């Protein structure tokens, strides 16, 4: 197949071949050869039709280009599709895991997996790779030819595996420049293992079990470009005494071995500039020979026991940096006379690291007299308690001085009276509580001063007098409680001020006003609760302000006044909280016209409800971080002012089962947004068209939510989308996700991470979303749905009509039996208690008590006893029984009919029971009173009432007052002359 590829490459360069664009996002690629009417000569041979046919067949027979957007174990990096990440995916079968990775991939990261073996031709389809990372696996075997085909690879990382020996495994890596084999179990390396690596520059074999340095030399001696060889933390004891030469080597590290000698007499390293032999056991190295290292510029002997008398200064004339730190104090400090004798004969020495070696201030004086240094590191010398007597007078050229991690508690200006050229001073991790006046005044050119991690409680501004050139001051992790406007008056040129990790609680008006040139101010990890108005006034050049990890909860009106050039504002992890979306009288950021980045992450109780004009004034903002808030409620157009926003992160806002709330039109004004992250928010659904205005969106991440369906409306108008991440959701294998399944598998523009591993989230299902059979979704169920729905509607209508009739009949039958029994009992056992039971609706109650009751129960004419619901029903008895008793104990039933009466179920029941009594007794016991005209069709559902109207006489309430006496006369006549017997005149009155 490789021969066929070469033919295709030659053809691509021919003007007679038209190539359909090799779009690596297609499933297949092919070549179409245009047939020329005349024979064309190519390399002395005729281009015949048979060859044309062969080439077309070859084009179609080549392995298909992998489907780019649906990997199982891997994902493309969201900002560069040429970078593929397969991290922490429990990969064991390498070939299967990377089979679907596109050919154009240049960077492949397979770290933190469970790969054990690299078989031959493992990466043959990834010839474009330049960076391959396989660290943190369990690789113990690399077969011959495993990397064949990777001619473009420049970096190979095999760190933290279980490789024990290195054989002929690197064939084909002709462009490799960096090979990392550290943290393995290598004991043996074949002499020809690295021969193919003709361009290798850096080889790391640190933290293995190598003891044979000769074997290493034999394996690397043929590498013409090797510059760096790292053998840190092995078990090498002796160097090779066979004549060898590594001409290109510039850096060699034996750090952390067990060297007994430093004899390079047989090894020619003419271009070696850096040699590290630090931490090499407890035994004294006596055999030292460095003559063959004429270009040596840096020598690290820290933690190595060596007799300095054996170091010949004449062989180190080009040495510029030397580390003589004493990490093993069991052998005592170095003799200062011996040190001075050596250093005094190194004319080019500029840097000396002398940690844990100086016993006191006198030792510094002695050391300073024998050298002319530019950088001196005296850190971690626990015997240094104070400096006050011109200890550095003999080092007037010194530019950098490190005194960190000592026990210093006192200094004065005499300490560095001669250090006129000092630009950097590190006094961190000491025991300074304060400094005397003018302590640093001689340091006219000092640009960097670190006082971090000292127990300083307050700042004496006079101590810093004279530091007019200072550009960076580090006061982090001290015990500072208060600062005021006098604290920084001595720093007119200060650009960076770090006050982080202190105990500052309040910032007063004008505290930083003298710092006109300050560009970066760090106040994170303090106890700030109150920021007075104009706390930052005067900082007209401030670019970055860090207020993270404090206790800020609100902002004064003029807090950020004067910060016209502020680009970065960090307010994360405070207590900023709002409880309403009402408009703020003073929007906090309205004057930050140039702000580019705003961090509001992790407010202790969540921002909760973001006010509607909270972001007013931030027209230049490009990056907004709102994630890690327990609660964020965005129900207005809060983002409308952010017209230039390109990155928005609202991830990690879930609080228990509560999810992030987003208004449907929240994003409508973010026309330039490119990156949107809504990860880990408990989102269960998305509002259609919510994101349709984000036409510039390129990266959209919704991973680790509870989404079940993704449909077309969610991604509508996202024309620039390149990366869409919904990994870790609960997508269901239903027809609702049919569009997403088909789109994600066929899109050529958008990458969906780990698409091929999305499981179906139905209980008991083991299938994947991409395997979902969508045949049932394509079946036209319209007619079936129509017939089913039509049948259901028809059945419902018939059943409703039938059930209404049946229920009425059942009730009718039930109460016929009951009425028959009760009526018979009343007839034989008791007399009537009432002349009439009045059946009326609650709406007509006023008419009954105002007109009917007075007319029939009161007055000089014949009166009647009426039974009324609220007055005469017996409490505690079932309402059905009360109605039945009222009808049975009354001679007649008065039905007061109105439109309201027809809609009352209780009235319907009363009519039915009265009809049963009429049916049983064969007497005219029902009197109908119509309060208003009612059309006949409205009585259709009241079939029994309709029948009564047809058979019985009814009386209508007259509109005219003059006709009402006649109306009542007719009612009395209908009720009859007979009244209730006197022995039954007692009434049951209900309050």
Swiss-Prot record:
Residue ranges of domain TIR in the record: 832-975
Signal peptide: 1-68
All ranges on the Extracellular side of the membrane: 69-783
Membrane topology, record value: Single-pass type I membrane protein
GO molecular function, one term: rRNA binding
Topological domains annotated Cytoplasmic: 805-991
Start and stop residues of the LRR repeats: 104-125, 128-149, 152-174, 175-196, 199-220, 225-246, 248-268, 271-292, 295-315, 318-338, 348-368, 372-394, 397-418, 421-442, 445-466, 469-490, 493-514, 517-538, 541-562, 565-585, 594-617, 620-641, 644-665, 672-693, 696-716
SUPFAM superfamilies reported in the protein's UniProt record: L domain-like (SSF52058), Toll/Interleukin receptor TIR domain (SSF52200)
Keywords assigned: Endosome, Glycoprotein, Immunity, Inflammatory response, Innate immunity, Leucine-rich repeat, Membrane, NAD, Receptor, Repeat, RNA-binding, Signal, Transmembrane, Transmembrane helix
Glycosylation site list: 93, 109, 125, 152, 167, 209, 233, 263, 271, 274, 300, 310, 357, 388, 413, 421, 644, 663, 711, 742
GO BP, one annotated term: MyD88-dependent toll-like receptor signaling pathway
Entry keyword annotation includes ATP-binding: no
Extra remark beyond the main annotation: The sequence 23S rRNA from clinical isolates of erythromycin-resistant S.aureus is methylated and is not recognized by Tlr13 anymore, suggesting a link between antibiotic resistance and evasion from Tlr13 recognition. 23S rRNA modifications generating resistance toward MLS antibiotics preventing recognition of bacteria from Tlr13. These data may also explain why Tlr13 is not conserved in human: human may instead possess a related rRNA-sensing pattern recognition receptor that has evolved to recognize species that can hide from Tlr13 owing to rRNA modifications.
Record family assignment: Belongs to the Toll-like receptor family.
Primary role: Component of innate and adaptive immunity that recognizes and binds 23S rRNA from bacteria. TLRs (Toll-like receptors) control host immune response against pathogens through recognition of molecular patterns specific to microorganisms. Acts via MYD88 and TRAF6, leading to NF-kappa-B activation, cytokine secretion and the inflammatory response. Specifically binds the 5'-CGGAAAGACC-3' sequence on bacterial 23S rRNA, a sequence also bound by MLS group antibiotics (including erythromycin). May also recognize vesicular stomatitis virus; however, these data require additional evidences.
Protein name according to UniProt: Toll-like receptor 13
